[in-house]
Amino acid sequence: MNPNQKIITIGVVNTTLSTIALLIGVGNLIFNTVIHEKIGDHQTVVYPTITAPVVPNCSDTIITYNNTVINNITTTIITEAERHFKPSLPLCPFRGFFPFHKDNAIRLGENKDVIVTREPYVSCDNDNCWSFALAQGALLGTKHSNGTIKDRTPYRSLIRFPIGTAPVLGNYKEICVAWSSSSCFDGKEWMHVCMTGNDNDASAQIIYAGKMTDSIKSWRRDILRTQESECQCIDGTCVVAVTDGPAANSADHRVYWIREGKVIKYENVPKTKIQHLEECSCYVDTDVYCVCRDNWKGSNRPWMRINNETILETGYVCSKFHSDTPRPADPSTVSCDSPSNVNGGPGVKGFGFKTGDDVWLGRTVSTNGRSGFEIIKVTEGWINSPNHAKSVTQTLVSNNDWSGYSGSFIVENNGCFQPCFYIELIRGRTNKNDDVSWTSNSIVTFCGLDNEPGSGNWPDGSNIGFMPK
């Protein structure tokens, strides 16, 4: 480096250091100004007082400083908005049903990342709606998924995941060990009823606010089971329908009232009308209504009306257009107080909504298999009337496509409960031509609005040939 370059380099370094020093000085000045202003806002300074000397012949002056600093500390407490128990509300008016969510779980499972499930349902809290399902402890197309056609194994558990999403590793929460379940939100906390154990000695564990709070033991020792859809809560008391006993003979049916996770009472469902009842789909329309499955004698569906104290009414949906599967061709018998005794068993989980004397019924399009899905409105179908007529038919899944269970759920919306339902779209070993070792499902959901709906077809849509075996 020649002398000129050295001089230039030294000059540049000197200028840089000077600039840094200047910036530090300016920053220090600003900092001190701000600090003094804050101290001025928050302290009271008593200026020095001069005290005369105590010792004679001494020229010293004693200066006493009395500094008092007052710090004003403001504490802000953020409290969560107080939650209230869900009230009793009527159903919102509706004229048809509109697509809400579709999870496409089987199509998305082509790469084996999707959890094998069945018996799905939907339930909502104050903020979100959630999908629930009974998982099989296996991923689609893996070796552990072979044989997942079985209903009850110790590997099944109730899981929850965001509605409209497929159940994959990373987006689900395991709730409890269960091969039968029901869930509901009381306005403050979630409650889950989870059945598991040996067929002849099962128990139901009640989970409330994430803690196990109570249990129900099998009393008939014959597959204790519950709704496979949401229970319902009014003013903090939740109502759950439970069955124990044969699937195709006389069984025991109970309604349990549970508050904050504790059983407060139960009643036996009277057998004067209902011969068999399981897998109820319940909703609130001031009282709790449950539309259920008769797996023994009825292709018409049994129902109950319940409040927070007792079972108020029971019967069978009167409509001559039946909604279980299998069922006779339309029209069939009108039977309001007993099962139809026509194509009575086995059956499939389903739902209905009462609107005055009319009734909306979901059902498979096929009369003898789980394919297709439609919802019909039967004028005066809730009562014994000669005027039963299908005034509305919405075909939502064509008869060329597989369906399965269906059930109701409700969403609080502007002072009433919006009626909604889901359709389980089963794929796998239960279906002819589905040449795979597993059984699983996707779902599609619909909600009612007081508008005229359009039309469409919303099947599972997966090409089974693309799927892992």
UniProtKB/Swiss-Prot annotation:
Residues 1-6 are intravirion. It is found in: Virion membrane; Host apical cell membrane. The chain crosses the membrane at residues 7-29. Residues 30-469 are virion surface. It comes from Influenza A virus (strain A/Tern/South Africa/1961 H5N3). Residues 11-33 are annotated as: Involved in apical transport and lipid raft association. This is Neuraminidase. Its main location: virion. GO terms for molecular function: exo-alpha-sialidase activity; metal ion binding. Inhibited by the neuraminidase inhibitors zanamivir (Relenza) and oseltamivir (Tamiflu). These drugs interfere with the release of progeny virus from infected cells and are effective against all influenza strains. Resistance to neuraminidase inhibitors is quite rare. Gene3D superfamilies: 2.120.10.10. It is an enzyme of class 3 (hydrolase).
